[in-house]
Amino acid sequence: MQPLTHEPIMTAMPTPTNADGIDASVTNEPTWFQTHFIGCMEMFADAKTAAEYFDAHQGWFIRCAHPMKAKPIGANGYALTIGKFGSFGYQVEPKIGLHLLPQDEGVYRIETIPVPNYTPPGYEVDFKAVQTLVEIPFEPSEELAADGSTLPSKMTRVEWQLDLKVGVCFPQFIKKLPEAVIQKTGDRILAQIVKLVSNRLTYKVQEDFHTSQGEATLKLFKKHWQQTKGRGVCEQVSPAL
């Protein structure tokens, strides 16, 4: 897997300053962008085993989030710094607080919480995610079945949904651009960020989980990933949850 870049997804122009005669003062009213995604992680174990892993997120979340920076907030929260993103000469380095609620009969929810001693500089984030553990019979492909390895009888699909909204207080010089241009660009960048983070985080969590289950299970996961190329991991949808 390639490391998560901390460079902007879009190449930004040099940041204007007042010395250039451009109004760089920030507006008070945020412009809101939103995106909605669904996806799935496949775990080659029963739901009980998968749930035990997710319940013990303190042991893997920070490690799997790397190279993003993650710091604990209490027992079930994390302050996550995503990286630098931007366009039109304006960049932000989002830091969000995420609360991983304890499971409720195989359902996990993640929501936004404040980051202690931190005020977001010109942006707001509303993050709502739901993960559901679904245990199903394992039906291997012909290639996996012919491998001769011992295969599990059950597997768990971790089906997730994300509703993400971000409000940004732009400088005045950006607000002079057509509203439709700002909206379209912002929505697109937000979707790119979600795809980038989700694809890499999903792989690392799956790899970490299957490593914990032994060499044979890790080998099975990697073969399956090569066959599927990560299909279904992350897909943008509409409307909102």
Task: Label the model's feature ranges.
Residues 62-68, 98, 124-135, 157-166, ...:
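Domain-wide signal for the mature, well-folded portions of proteins, strongly enriched
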Residues 2-91, 97-99:
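Hydrophobic ligand-binding cavity/cleft-lining segments
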Residues 2-21, 210-241:
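Charge-rich (especially acidic), low-complexity segments
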Residues 57, 112-114:
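Acidic, aromatic-enriched beta-alpha/helix-loop junctions
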Residues 177-230:
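A conserved amphipathic terminal alpha-helix motif
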Residues 39-47, 84-88, 94, 100-106, ...:
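Beta-strand elements of well-folded, non-transmembrane domains
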Residues 70-76, 101-105, 150-154:
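Short, ordered beta-strand-loop transition motifs
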Residues 120-187:
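Beta-strand/loop substructures that line and gate deep hydrophobic ligand-binding cavities in soluble
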